[in-house]
Amino acid sequence: MMTRFACLHLFTMFLFTLLSGSSSAVITTESPLSMGQTLSSANEVYELGFFSPNNTQDQYVGIWFKDTIPRVVVWVANREKPVTDSTAYLAISSSGSLLLLNGKHGTVWSSGVTFSSSGCRAELSDSGNLKVIDNVSERALWQSFDHLGDTLLHTSSLTYNLATAEKRVLTSWKSYTDPSPGDFLGQITPQVPSQGFVMRGSTPYWRSGPWAKTRFTGIPFMDESYTGPFTLHQDVNGSGYLTYFQRDYKLSRITLTSEGSIKMFRDNGMGWELYYEAPKKLCDFYGACGPFGLCVMSPSPMCKCFRGFVPKSVEEWKRGNWTGGCVRHTELDCLGNSTGEDADDFHQIANIKPPDFYEFASSVNAEECHQRCVHNCSCLAFAYIKGIGCLVWNQDLMDAVQFSATGELLSIRLARSELDGNKRKKTIVASIVSLTLFMILGFTAFGVWRCRVEHIAHISKDAWKNDLKPQDVPGLDFFDMHTIQNATNNFSLSNKLGQGGFGSVYKGKLQDGKEIAVKRLSSSSGQGKEEFMNEIVLISKLQHRNLVRVLGCCIEEEEKLLIYEFMVNKSLDTFLFDSRKRLEIDWPKRFDIIQGIARGLLYLHHDSRLRVIHRDLKVSNILLDEKMNPKISDFGLARMYQGTEYQDNTRRVVGTLGYMSPEYAWTGMFSEKSDIYSFGVLMLEIISGEKISRFSYGVEGKTLIAYAWESWSEYRGIDLLDQDLADSCHPLEVGRCIQIGLLCVQHQPADRPNTLELLAMLTTTSDLPSPKQPTFAFHTRDDESLSNDLITVNGMTQSVILGR
């Protein structure tokens, strides 16, 4: 009897467990949704259930894409108040109201409406819309699409209604682990034509530009031929709605992040592809250059004033604070003279995102649009835009951006004197300046030449050769200068391959037909005798398929040359940062390059006769042979140690900003882990296609490392991936590589993997430790006034070459 009772008890417990983890089709008054249960859409595209975004006892009811990893939540019911009781459940009342009940604590959340109904149910559609439906009329009594969260899904809409003062907006999460309402709203405006805004409180944060039939004119990839997933309708009664229809992809979404970014995703079959994000760069942020300021969109965005305008505050402008904008250099004279020869006229500027505060004039043609503005002295600018018609500006031109290709033609009213100018005066000034500069340069060049001649006269022609003998570098050839000059066509510009940190590199061909690369040390560079001798001696002792091979050297008078094997494909940066050539290295090839560099590092750190710390590992020092195999080059800054030594300290900090580990940049301490840090930066560059010294994200100017950490924390890093690789990558492999890259750039050297561990991480699928949030110490820029190479000499430390 006891045995039978025990079996019955076990069966009951098993049945309860099975039911508690089951998936329901609908929620009714008789069948609520308990914690552990889920509600799936008909074709199992979406799922409703309880979840915890921060892996705590805090539970929320939400909707997410079913069977996608990581989970992407698109709507949350109880955003402001989580439940903590495991007995909580989602129910539907007899009056059609959805209720989230937290055990004995009562109602936590309610849909807030009641209906006269004989019966109703809640079900989840394949568009991700949770609906309460009347069982008799089949009419939707309530739906989640009317109460948006942070995500816009297929067939959902942003709306406004001036008569009722109602609007439907996106509201960001407070953080990526806190779904309560954050600081940002995404909405459309009631002006005609409407435009999209991200608002931070009551302050504009980002603007889409006015709607033009099928596109937003302020989003660069939406040109005149664009037909995308949006439709916008505005009526004369003061209401409008923007609907998102994405028919080309099964899964897609538009999310307003906790940091105020609009991100557009689509599932390409291999994972989420981030195909648009804003704001991202300076010009994306609302009013970055202030009134009458123009933000020029480029790899290094910059502000300038429209023609005829000058900075309102020159001092603030010089400090990089452009928000004060610009003011007119010469006031208009429209009222006094509107038709004569000295009347104001219009200056045209192309590829413009239409500024804010426009007014819709009519759908007339371009010439009539021009005439309307000419005869209205309050009209400061106009634009005739396909899909809109005539827009005019009677207020300050705010949030104007100039794109590199797409955009609209904007005509700005200027005083006649600003357009005519004084050409003769400009010519005279230019001639005087040119002549003065020529004379200064001539005298300077003559003085430098005289000093060089006098200095060289005191140097023995064979001084360098006496310091370096063939027996010191077995296997290397000594070339004479005449041979190298013939091979490189006397170092002609047509033979120049590029400019390195310590000089120029030229392509050459020896008499036997062998192609070579010649590194010619610049006399003005920071690499002197120590680095040059170091590179020759070191590289002669290293042989590995992922290290560049040196063939010989040439030392005559002040000339110092290194002769390398020629790399057909030059350096990795020529591919990675070129908009066309980057397409030649898909994800499998980039992953091979990452592994090849790691193998080269392993040889330097562990497998060679000498332990070598490179100290200047960066993308321009990775050369590619004809099969795109990577080879580490440029050993001028490397250090060699015996097998028991693992770190050293120098007072001479040399390297490249962005790639230098914190302990090396700040204290001069370097080790194998310093190269690991540089490798981590290099990995993130290869994955993203972005340059560490140029990348700047958000209004805070986040570095590539900061953005990689944020991306990995929120989406396992998939939106960091170069968008050109979407069709060739495996998301899990990319996410793993980003995690490895973040492990390599940890602040503490002890938290970084060594080279053996690094290669194991790249070649196996073993579990990886979770990285800590890195310290984003350096944010460098490629400004003309800054050098990419940091060579700060506070003393001299002599290299010591010891056997392993």
Curated annotation (Swiss-Prot):
- Enzyme Commission identifier(s): 2.7.11.1
Domain Bulb-type lectin residues, every copy: 25-145
Q: Does the keyword ATP-binding apply?
A: yes
**Which GO terms of the molecular function aspect are on file?**
ATP binding; calmodulin binding; carbohydrate binding; protein serine kinase activity; protein serine/threonine kinase activity; ubiquitin protein ligase binding
- Could you confirm whether the keyword Translocase appears in this record? no
**What is the similarity comment for this entry?**
Belongs to the protein kinase superfamily. Ser/Thr protein kinase family.
Record-given protein name = G-type lectin S-receptor-like serine/threonine-protein kinase At1g61500
Q: Which cysteines are joined by disulfide bonds?
A: 283-295, 289-303, 369-390, 373-379
Look up the record and give one Gene Ontology term from the biological process aspect: recognition of pollen
- What species is given as this protein's source? Arabidopsis thaliana
